[in-house]
Amino acid sequence: MIINLHHFGEKIINFLGDGSNYGLKISYSLEKELLGTGGGIWNSIHHFQDPFIALSSDTWTDFNLKGLSLEKGKLAHMVLVPNPEHNLAGDVALLNGLIDLQSGNNKYTFSGISILSPELFNESKVFKAELWDDFLKPAAAKGLVSGELYEGAFENLNTIKDVERLDASLGEE
């Protein structure tokens, strides 16, 4: 597991350590300046030879990560979710299992869960980059990004109130 760090990086390292308490081997990629999600992955891509799962740390879900796979010939696979209140317009459409940039209908929101091929980052010389704008969108335009819609439990935790609301709802179960 690679954890990309900037804000409170030392505290996270001190808390998680090498991961052995959790049955993991954790490596850290420290950013002195924010590189963006794509830049953070690009900065640590040397750790990966095979496709890997990228998961935003501000999400909570019961999505089964074991079910993720990358179709032969594709550079990425994105998990989409129904649009939340803060993104009613959605991000992208899904057409025949591919991320569709042309369609204006039935757009969904990118969950922050994906499986990525290291090849997605091969041609890049960028240092600061966004995963969507600089890597996934150009690949999707070439038909190289598949996707799926997940309609199960999913929360994007953008604020302390979001975390408190989730904690309260989980306490009720």
Regions found by a protein language model. Give the residues of each.
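Conserved beta-loop-beta/alpha segment of the NTase-like Rossmann-fold superfamily
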Residues: 13-14, 19-90, 94-96
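Short glycine-rich loop/turn motifs that provide flexible caps or phosphate-binding loops at active sites
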Residues: 8, 16, 35-39, 111, ...
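Short beta-strand/loop segment that forms part of the nucleotide-sugar
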Residues: 1-7, 29
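Short, surface-exposed alpha-helical segments at coil->helix boundaries
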Residues: 9-13, 133
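Catalytic-core segments of class I nucleotidyltransferases/pyrophosphorylases
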Residues: 60, 65-70, 83-86, 98-173
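Structured beta->alpha junctions
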Residues: 5, 32-33, 105
